[in-house]
């Protein structure tokens, strides 16, 4: 079962994460034979400085943590170096310099196998906008002891950290969250495109949604119609944000997990089909809200701000 396999990957001896992971570096000078977590984690390593990771690392720096970073992109490392941040050439060097290491990487295949007695899988919700603002929500799986120790890190990068249970539960929660998000985005996009076809402006319909029973994040915070809302991917040709290929990946995980669990999943299957088609048509790098334009053929709007 997909979730069971995820839990096995999040074991202390072989930890891999598709999103954000936290683990306590194994350093003899830090740990006793009982492997108790220290009460204060000041030196933070950060591996993965993409659209999300760079912003999260910046928020840790602003919060006063001593941060050491690594990324395969040398240009990104140069930017952090010019900011006075310590940079390392390898993940191992980051680990040696840190009390705790954070990874923010696109898939499990990108995460190194490292020996670590304490680990949390902690996927995030909120996207680039929340990463920039420091208002992410973390879904956390692992030991309660490690969760308690990591709270200062979470609340330096986000507004909430929800403990979901044992190892792998954070990723399980993230899969379910993104399934609901994908389905809601499809519903909002379909309704707005239909409204346009019936002569109701998407901006007008969005106002109705946002003060009625149809209100949801895809409508009031991440509107998919270009011209309706500023500062979201639809306002910049669907660049930035959460790539359609990543949404398709999460829907594949959700579908596989549902099959293994014996759960009915008709909406998952349909959403999976639509996002796979979207990616196959060349829109895999665009934000997942581009489904409004490239699947439903909805129209841009020009709204007086």
Model-derived features: positions:
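Rossmann-like adenosine-cofactor binding region
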Residues: 106-114
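Short glycine-/small-residue-rich Rossmann-like dinucleotide-binding loops
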Residues: 99, 105-107, 124, 142
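Rossmann-fold dinucleotide-binding core
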Residues: 115-182
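Methionine-biased hydrophobic packing positions in alpha-helices, especially
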Residues: 52, 56, 104, 117, ...
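Hydrophobic residues within alpha-helices
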Residues: 56-60, 153, 194
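Helical "substrate-binding/catalytic lid" subdomain
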Residues: 169-302
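NAD(P)+-binding Rossmann beta1-loop-alpha1 motif at the extreme N-terminus of oxidoreductases
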Residues: 2-104, 118, 128-131, 162, ...
């Amino acid at each position: 079962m997909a979730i069971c396999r995820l839990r096995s990957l999040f074991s202390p001896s072989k930890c891999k994460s598709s999103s954000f992971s936290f683990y306590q570096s194994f350093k003899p000078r830090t740990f006793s034979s009982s492997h108790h977590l220290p009460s204060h984690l000041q030196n933070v390593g950060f591996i993965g400085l993409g659209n999300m990771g760079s912003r999260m690392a910046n928020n840790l720096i602003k919060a006063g943590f001593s941060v050491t970073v690594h990324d395969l992109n040398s240009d990104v490392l140069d930017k952090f170096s010019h900011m006075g941040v310590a940079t390392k050439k390898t993940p191992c060097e980051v680990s040696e310099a840190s009390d705790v290491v954070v990874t923010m990487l696109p898939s499990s295949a990108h995460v190194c196998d490292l020996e670590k007695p304490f680990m949390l899988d902690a996927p995030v919700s909120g996207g680039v906008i929340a990463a920039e603002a420091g208002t992410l929500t973390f879904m956390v799986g692992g030991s309660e002891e490690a969760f308690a120790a990591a709270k200062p890190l979470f609340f330096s990068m986000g507004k909430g950290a929800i403990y979901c249970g044992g190892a792998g539960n954070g990723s399980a929660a993230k899969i379910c969250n993104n399934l609901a998000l994908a389905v809601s985005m499809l519903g909002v996009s379909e309704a707005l495109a239909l409204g346009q076809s019936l002569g109701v402006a998407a901006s007008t319909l969005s106002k109705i949604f946002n003060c009625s029973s149809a209100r949801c994040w895809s409508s009031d915070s991440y509107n998919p119609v270009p011209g309706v809302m500023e500062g979201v991917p639809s306002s910049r040709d669907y660049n930035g944000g959460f790539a359609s290929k990543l949404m398709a990946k999460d829907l594949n995980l959700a579908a596989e997990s549902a099959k293994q669990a014996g759960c009915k999943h008709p909406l998952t299957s349909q959403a999976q089909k639509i996002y796979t088609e979207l990616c196959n048509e060349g829109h895999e790098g665009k934000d997942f809200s581009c489904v409004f334009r490239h699947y439903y053929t909805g129209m841009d709007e020009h709204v007086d701000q």
